Amino acid sequence: LGRSGELERITGIEKIFRLPIVNDWDKKGLGRKFFTFPDLSLGKEEQENIVAALQNLCKKSVFLVPDSQSADAIKQFYEDNLKDTKVFDAKDIEESKQPFVDSSAATVILANRFDGIDFSNDESRLLFIWNLPKTTNLQEKFLITRMGASKLYAERIRTRIIQAVGRCSRNPSDYSIVCVIGDTIQNDLTKQEKIKQFAPELRAEIQFGLENSMDYSNVNDVLELKIF
């Protein structure tokens, strides 16, 4: 956060001295991410089938959703269709995420959370991003959608996306599947003018995911990512 004046707006300080970035630090990410965008080739009617199939494949997952209403809907879906999978929310792991870690099959549903809780290594290899919004409050939403101030928040939105997709890959040897479902955040991950703003490694991972996702013809094609 710096090139667009984000720090100055947040703190109200006019002049901020910035420490230089370590060589190549801004060009590398933590771990590897296999992106999949099933909505690009499969209909929305397949979304629930994709979630169930990937959950059964990986057993443990993290679910990022926009609000508590969406969280309740996802929780109900798991209770109805994936009865052997334990469902946790932010309150359940507030003091410790160990109950989730110790479960053989589980998901943790986090509403409107871009950062703050990490799941490294085998804690979770699967991350669902479900209609996650680019804004976190009404003021940001108003300025972006009604006042045409999207450029002012472009850097902040990009940072949030980077934080969101990295919840399950927290060290250089870590890896995770990132399944993006819904239109809100997907637009920032599929448009070429937006993709080129990301670091080279993340940009390549997104591009690879886009190319693969265009050829899905059924849910089984999505499951081919188990090779990853």
Show where each model-derived region lies:
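Long, largely alpha-helical accessory region at the distal end of helicase-like NTP-driven motors
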Residues: 171-228
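Conserved strand-helix element at the start of the C-terminal RecA-like helicase core
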Residues: 1, 54-78
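Interdomain hinge/linker at the junction between the two RecA-like core domains of SF2 helicases
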Residues: 2-54
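Helical mechanochemical/support elements of P-loop NTPase systems and associated helical scaffolds
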Residues: 3, 46, 70, 153, ...
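Conserved RecA-like P-loop NTPase helicase motor core
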Residues: 99-188
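Conserved RecA-like helicase motor-core motifs
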Residues: 15-22, 62, 79-95
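Conserved helicase motor
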Residues: 65-69, 85-98, 111-115
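Gly-rich Lys/Arg/Thr-decorated short loops/hinges at beta-loop-alpha junctions or inter-strand turns
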Residues: 26-36, 79, 140-148
